[in-house]
Design a protein with these regions (language model features):
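C-terminal region of N-terminal signal peptides and the immediate post-cleavage residues
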Residues: 22-35
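Short acidic, S/G/P-rich loop/turn micro-motifs used as interaction or catalytic elements
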Residues: 143-145, 192, 244, 284-285
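Short, aromatic/basic amphipathic alpha-helical patches
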Residues: 149-157, 198, 288-294
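Long, acidic (Asp/Glu-rich), low-complexity accessory segments flanking structured domains
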Residues: 11-14, 32-86, 100-114, 118-128, ...
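Surface-exposed substrate-engagement region within the catalytic domains
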Residues: 165-271
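Structural recognition of the beta-strand scaffold that forms the well-ordered cores
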Residues: 55-58, 89-93, 134-138, 183-187, ...
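N-terminal secretory signal peptides and thylakoid transit peptides that target proteins
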Residues: 1-19
């Protein structure tokens, strides 16, 4: 059985907990404590300025602002600031155009967060940790304005609201030294500036099968890690998250431990440059972020 993500987001409030608990016996029995990670806030400081971003292994979050909306909608428990402090360096930011601004949404659900709030969190973090960079995907969500209007709002943030100096907006991947202290824009909208276009096959190799059933998703994640190790070049992005069959939290209960255990396995020992690894609820599994970060070049 596969559940369409858009239908899920429209109907999330009407799903009964009893019905969910019957699905394949995979639901957690009760509330669980979330383990804080030990990832450092300055992990990029150990990497040389000449390091290509594509040769790093970068923890990220899927739908980074999605903390509200209920079981089928929430993808994160950490705030943006908490994610960055824990070692997350890729943010997946979904923006609805409303009133000349970007409101952060997951489907129809406003996340009590505006784009300016996200930028403030990034600015404050990077000011305190100048060795770091943040890679940010910006995507339109739950609005259907044209590219020109979406761009006009983004330009307003850059210029009238004074955020241009925070961004690195380029046509190709910068080396880490050029990106330190900056937000590197990954444009997932035709109107956004710069040449790092989300999905450009010359720049990216993306695994994001969000409709894969939980048992079918893991082989896709594992095989994309193997491809990244065997064929370096583009920016690999390997979404651990899936929206099929179960709520994001429950899928993360299965996929996050599998990811940690693979990265800690003998097969993965010594591999570097595994790309960006966006996850739901990365705080749920002790040692997960450390396992991702361990696959960066030693210096």
């Amino acid at each position: 059985m596969s559940i369409d993500r858009r239908s899920v987001l429209r109907g999330a409030a009407g799903v009964s907990a009893a019905g969910l608990l019957s699905y394949a016996g995979m639901a957690p029995a009760g509330a669980r404590a979330r383990a804080r990670t030990t990832a450092t806030a300055d992990w990029m400081a150990s990497q040389a300025d000449s390091t290509a971003l594509t040769r790093l292994t970068i923890p990220g979050t899927h739908d980074s602002g999605a903390r509200f909306g209920g079981l089928w909608v929430q993808c994160q428990s950490w705030t943006i600031a908490q994610q960055l402090a824990a070692g997350i360096r890729f943010l997946d930011i979904r923006c609805r155009v409303t009133g000349g601004s970007y409101a952060i949404h997951h489907g129809a659900f406003f996340q009590n967060l505006m784009f300016g709030d996200v930028l403030i969190a990034c600015r404050d973090f990077l000011a305190a940790h100048p060795s770091e960079t943040v890679l940010m995907r910006v995507k339109q969500e739950y609005s259907e304005v044209g590219d020109a209007e979406f761009r006009a709002v983004f330009d307003d943030y850059l210029d009238r609201r004074g955020w241009r100096s925070l961004f690195h907006i380029g046509d190709s991947w910068p080396a880490l030294g050029a990106a330190r202290g900056k937000v590197v824009l990954m444009a997932d909208n035709g109107g956004l500036p710069g040449g790092i276009r989300w999905g450009d096959s010359n720049l990216f190799a993306i695994q994001d099968d969000y409709n894969a059933e939980p048992f079918g998703k893991w082989p896709k994640v594992r095989d994309h890690f193997r491809r990244a190790a065997a064929s370096p070049g583009p920016q690999y992005i390997n979404f651990v998250s899936t929206a099929a069959g179960l709520p994001p939290d429950w899928n993360a209960d299965r996929l996050n431990p599998q990811t940690r255990d693979f990265l800690n396995s003998g097969e993965a020992a010594g591999l570097t440059g595994l790309g960006i690894v966006p996850m739901d609820f990365p705080d749920a599994v002790s040692g997960l972020l450390g396992a991702v970060l361990a696959h960066n070049p030693a210096r």
